[in-house]
From Swiss-Prot:
It comes from Streptococcus thermophilus (strain CNRZ 1066). It catalyses: O-phospho-L-serine + 2-oxoglutarate = 3-phosphooxypyruvate + L-glutamate; 4-(phosphooxy)-L-threonine + 2-oxoglutarate = (R)-3-hydroxy-2-oxo-4-phosphooxybutanoate + L-glutamate. Belongs to the class-V pyridoxal-phosphate-dependent aminotransferase family. SerC subfamily. This is Phosphoserine aminotransferase. Binds 1 pyridoxal phosphate per subunit. Keywords: Amino-acid biosynthesis, Aminotransferase, Cytoplasm, Pyridoxal phosphate, Pyridoxine biosynthesis, Serine biosynthesis, Transferase. The gene is serC. GO terms for molecular function: O-phospho-L-serine:2-oxoglutarate aminotransferase activity; pyridoxal phosphate binding. One of its GO terms (biological process) is pyridoxine biosynthetic process. Homodimer.
Length: 364
């Protein structure tokens, strides 16, 4: 039985990446050591991390005046690290189109009780269960604000921002955790991008931060571990980084570049792959996708429901027994969610659609 992993993260990794990691696990390139055990100061790892950065820069067309940092703590740590480094003494706006954006705003509010800055909720679609990306009047944004924070892809609700909003000249900070490398963005449109690895980059445990150099604050932070400047100047080696996770990420970057053909080709594949499932849901009067506007639909996370919660539960149980794993929707929204990140096979979407048709026929 073929197993398809629809998990929202940690997610499917490319098979060639896993095979290469397996082949090199005990003896990395005749070093006599595994990457799991080699020093982060060794010449072997120095090449790994530099190659990882170079390939990511090429894939995303990252300009020279941006630093790339590999950090620990997941994207959730960035909810604190961003305002701590960028917003002291200023306003910071938050566009909340999903649960993770709300968490970022909530953490900012919590931090504002400790350091002087003002987090402002710019707009939210929480009142409609985040079924769309909220709009706002850019003239309401103070042009002296530190940044506008947004989440480019909402894993739970299945929405995405593809065209960046007008922010009245205020720099944009983006949580790009769940659609980085799956859609093309112009890095120069952002002051800072951060992304947890466990969707489209690699295993959980490493977070990529891409930050424009003029946003590296000279003021000492509460902790050196939370200071972008210190981390950037140390080349991501201020302390021992998650070496193996960075190594796997490098292999994924190589896969996107050499086997897929780059981000534009990857984005094309994602649009086609997710479109198969969206088209079927649209053609069905049994399944529903809750996203209000088709232009907001995610190419990575596709939530859907049947006519009842009982049928949802039955669907999840039967799907799991057939190898469609982790397809249950997030507890906050229910239903089902098919997360089809970059490494998820197209055949898995086709097989899921076949099962959905069969389930619909048997349960109408």
């Amino acid at each position: 039985m073929t197993i398809y992993n629809f998990s929202a993260g940690p997610a499917t990794l490319p098979k060639p990446v896993l095979e290469k990691a397996q082949a090199e696990l005990l003896n990395y390139q005749d070093s006599g050591m595994s990457v799991l055990e080699m020093s982060h100061r060794s010449p072997e790892f120095d090449k790994i991390i530099k190659d990882a950065e170079a390939t990511l820069r090429e894939l995303m067309a990252i300009p020279d005046n941006y630093k790339v940092i590999f950090l620990q703590g997941g994207a959730s740590t960035q909810f604190t690290m961003v305002p701590l480094n960028l917003a002291q003494g200023k306003k910071a706006y938050y566009l909340v189109g999903g649960s993770w954006g709300k968490k970022a705003y909530t953490e900012a509010v919590k931090l504002s009780k400790t350091i002087p800055f003002e987090p402002i909720l710019l707009a939210s679609s929480e009142d409609t269960v985040y079924d769309h990306i909220p709009s706002f009047d850019p003239s309401t944004i103070d042009p002296e604000a530190a940044y506008v924070h947004l989440t480019t892809n909402n894993t739970i609700e299945g929405t995405s921002i593809y065209d960046l909003p007008d922010t009245n000249g205020v720099p944009i900070v983006a949580d790009m955790s769940s659609n980085i490398l799956a859609a093309r963005y112009n890095v120069e449109d952002f002051a800072l991008i951060y992304a947890g690895a466990q969707k489209n980059i690699g295993p959980a445990g490493v977070t990529v931060v891409i930050v424009r150099e003029d946003f590296l604050n000279d003021q000492p932070q509460l902790s050196a571990m939370l200071d972008y400047r210190i981390q950037a100047e140390a080349g991501s080696l201020y302390n021992t980084p998650p070496c193996f996770n960075i190594y796997i990420s490098k292999l994924v970057f190589d896969w996107v570049k050499n086997e897929i053909g780059g981000v534009d080709k990857m984005a094309e594949i994602q649009r086609e792959k997710s479109g198969l499932l969206y088209d079927y849901i649209e053609s069905s009067d049994f399944y529903t996708n809750p996203v209000k506007d088709a232009k907001d639909r995610s190419v990575c996370n596709i939530p859907f429901v049947t006519p009842s919660k009982d049928l949802d539960a039955k669907f999840v149980a039967e799907a799991d027994a057939l190898g469609f794993k982790n397809i249950k929707g997030h507890r906050s929204v229910g239903g089902m969610r098919a997360s089809v990140y970059n490494a998820f096979p197209r055949q898995g979407v086709l097989d899921l659609i076949d099962f959905m048709k069969k389930f619909e026929d048997e349960n109408k």
